[in-house]
């Protein structure tokens, strides 16, 4: 389907990718074919006129919480996880730049020889100048997930929508991989997610989105062209929003 260039439903969005999304069928690391495909999806959306920010997890390289459960100091583990997100951000920057676009990586922890510090006004300026901006190192603090970092950055840059890319095509009332009668929701309110105890994001991230009335869409990143379709207003996946919101 072709869309008019000016008919975007969302102008500025933040896309949250898990680190695992970069692995493909591998058990660890980054699959070049996968990251190049994802970069192509992002470029396609940018070419339609969207301002795009990204947050990428680090679970394909390191999970601090998992090793903390086995005895590693949690703060140290989380700091190592932050470094993993920087590795992924640099890999995505490289993939995007090879496709001819301008990209900036901004880190919540100081690593000046590698990427910029996160400064809100500078980040917004990058977006206004059509530079894809990748936010790395989460919030810069231990005990907070990259979901929390994504929600925080989306609010700070004034995003119209927070997109969480997963391997499932939305939110269900129960695990669709275990229950053939699982029901998918097209739209939910924040209160419905809480009352039904649905797993959308971690509690801190979800609270940030809810309190700032930030619309959140959960969708399957494996579908070709899905990002562009969402930006043009197609109802894909599950939208979580304030009950009376028009987003």
Curated annotation (Swiss-Prot):
Activity regulation (UniProt): Inhibited by UTP.
Keywords assigned by UniProt, alphabetized: ATP-binding, Cytoplasm, Kinase, Nucleotide-binding, Pyrimidine biosynthesis, Transferase
Protein's GO biological process: 'de novo' CTP biosynthetic process; UDP biosynthetic process
Domain of life: Bacteria
InterPro entries reported in the protein's UniProt record: AceGlu_kinase-like_sf, Asp/Glu/Uridylate_kinase, Uridylate_kinase, Uridylate_kinase_bac
Compartments where located: Cytoplasm
CC terms in the record's Gene Ontology section: cytosol
Catalytic activity: UMP + ATP = UDP + ADP
Pathway(s) it belongs to: Pyrimidine metabolism; CTP biosynthesis via de novo pathway; UDP from UMP (UMPK route): step 1/1
Name of a matching Pfam family: AA_kinase
EC top class, as a word: transferase
EC number: 2.7.4.22
Ligand binding (UMP): 58, 78, 139-146
GO molecular function, one term: UMP kinase activity
Binding sites annotated in the UniProt record for ATP: 16-19, 59, 63, 166, 172, 175
Similarity remark: Belongs to the UMP kinase family.
Subunit record text: Homohexamer.
Stored PANTHER family: URIDYLATE KINASE, URIDYLATE KINASE PUMPKIN, CHLOROPLASTIC
Protein function: Catalyzes the reversible phosphorylation of UMP to UDP.
Record protein name field: Uridylate kinase
Species of the source: Xylella fastidiosa (strain Temecula1 / ATCC 700964)
Top-level taxonomy: Bacteria, Pseudomonadati, Pseudomonadota, Gammaproteobacteria, Lysobacterales
